[in-house]
From Swiss-Prot:
Pathway: One-carbon metabolism; tetrahydrofolate interconversion; Amino-acid biosynthesis; glycine biosynthesis; glycine from L-serine: step 1/1. InterPro entries: PyrdxlP-dep_Trfase (IPR015424), PyrdxlP-dep_Trfase_major (IPR015421), PyrdxlP-dep_Trfase_small (IPR015422), Ser_HO-MeTrfase (IPR001085), Ser_HO-MeTrfase-like (IPR049943), Ser_HO-MeTrfase_PLP_BS (IPR019798), SHMT-like_dom (IPR039429). Its cofactor is pyridoxal 5'-phosphate. The lineage of its organism: Bacteria, Pseudomonadati, Pseudomonadota, Gammaproteobacteria, Enterobacterales. The gene is glyA. Homodimer. This is Serine hydroxymethyltransferase. It is found in: Cytoplasm. GO terms for biological process: glycine biosynthetic process from serine; tetrahydrofolate interconversion. (6S)-5,6,7,8-tetrahydrofolate binds at L121, G125, H126, L127, S355, P356, F357. Belongs to the SHMT family. GO terms for molecular function: glycine hydroxymethyltransferase activity; pyridoxal phosphate binding.
Length: 417
């Protein structure tokens, strides 16, 4: 018999120690990785529930296993909330991740060898949008599009590439682009050659839900997203669509299960349902508005201090620092800021002279600091500290001084009070 008082601390001290150390790290470090966020205790409660025990292959009302009457309710809640939140008439909440959601879309709509137009990884795209080291770059003929000299998406070049190569699919979305994407323009280009227009909005889904960033769902044939990042839910994926194309919806469902996944993770789907409900609350909109304000506040300080920001600013939750002119690598910047308890990630910049393992830039995002309660004042202060570190990247005294400031502000703004 299993006893509810069983716990990790008494049974596996080594594992528990590592888990507790991660809790301390999260509380005592400032998180600026654009794809990371803090989920709510309600989501974590769902993920630690007995739903983890239930196998439920299939979809609500059409399961291959018995005993699914209650997990059917859970999944249907998540589906209905996803559709309502994003203005879709189709939602699949089963993908285990954003990458898995993308796999399902590709395998539903493409054949190996088909031509796909996707954003260049070095210009802000994502691995699953055609990187040669990823399945997408290995299975499909990828034609990249990118940004112009101003740092904005080059729609003229995209249209030219589309006309020349006649891709079966055009991918919108990014992992390191700070501008507003013109979804309608991209759909127009796709329609001009009879291509599918697929959007991966993983990075901006929370902003979209709150009306802070344009919604791609009315424009795309299919949209995917993660449920963490700006949406602040559990780690997982969603597929969305609208337009009433039931044949498309059947293809997408079949591509998720049984083609690419087996049983859904019902405890995670419950977490998605909670997060989607939270995203409908008025305070979530206020939060997302503040995310955008904080990113802009940080950019202003970096520009004042003489740092180059790709595209010159941000219209969402993230931005890229281009450190080429400072003769600092992204790897060294990441390490120095890390010693000051500020977590970022090294990132390639356009025309980067360094390898992807070294890079010449760092990506910075505001969702996690905003979740802690940072406003513009704290965001500007933080950006100033980061400039102090980068201006004195080998000065351990400066790094230690900033670390103490970070510890103090983290104590003032705990992740979980």
């Amino acid at each position: 018999m299993l006893k509810r008082e069983m716990n990790i601390a008494d049974y596996d001290a080594d594992l528990w120690r590592a888990m507790e150390q991660e809790v301390v790290r999260q509380e005592e470090h400032i998180e600026l990785i654009a794809s990371e966020n803090y989920t709510s205790p309600r989501v974590m409660q769902a993920q630690g529930s007995q739903l983890t025990n239930k196998y439920a292959e299939g979809y609500p009302g059409k399961r291959y296993y018995g005993g699914c009457e209650y997990v059917d309710i859970v999944e249907q809640l998540a589906i209905d909330r996803a559709k309502e939140l994003f203005g879709a008439d189709y939602a699949n909440v089963q993908p285990h991740s954003g990458s898995q959601a993308n796999v399902a879309v590709y395998s539903a709509l493409l054949q190996p060898g088909d031509t796909v137009l996707g954003m260049n990884l070095a210009h802000g795209g994502h691995l699953t949008h055609g990187s040669p080291v990823n399945f997408s770059g290995k299975l499909y003929n990828i034609v990249p599009y990118g940004i112009d000299e101003s740092g904005k998406i080059d729609y003229e070049d995209m249209a030219s590439q589309a006309e020349r190569y006649k891709p079966k699919m055009i991918i919108g979305g990014f992992s390191a682009y700070s501008g507003i994407v013109d979804w309608a323009k991209m759909r127009e280009i796709a329609d001009s050659i009879g291509a599918y227009f697929f959007v991966d909005m993983a990075h901006v889904a929370g902003l979209v839900a709150a009306g802070v960033y344009p919604n791609p769902v009315p424009h795309a044939h299919v949209v995917t997203t993660t449920t963490h990042k700006t949406l602040a839910g559990p780690r997982g994926g969603l597929i969305l669509a609208r337009g009433g194309d039931e044949e498309l919806y059947k293809k997408l469902n079949s591509s998720v299960f049984p083609a690419n996944q087996g049983g859904p993770l019902m405890h995670v789907i419950a977490g998605k349902a909670v997060a989607l409900k939270e995203a409908m609350e008025p305070e979530f909109k206020v939060y997302q508005q503040q995310v955008a304000k904080n990113a802009k506040a940080m950019v202003a300080v970096f520009l004042e201090r003489g740092y180059k920001v790709v595209s010159g600013g941000t219209d969402n939750h993230l931005f890229l620092l281009d450190l080429v002119d400072k003769n600092i690598t992204g790897k060294d910047a990441d390490a120095a800021l890390g010693r000051a308890n500020i977590t970022v990630n090294k990132n390639s910049v356009p025309n980067d002279p360094k390898s992807p393992f070294v890079t010449s830039g760092v990506r910075i995002g505001s969702p996690a600091i905003t979740r802690r309660g940072f406003k513009e004042e704290e965001s500007r202060e933080l950006a100033g500290w980061m400039c102090d570190v980068l201006d004195n990247i080998t000065d351990e005294a400066t790094i230690e001084r900033i670390k103490q400031k970070v510890l103090a502000i983290c104590a003032r703004f705990p992740v979980y009070a």
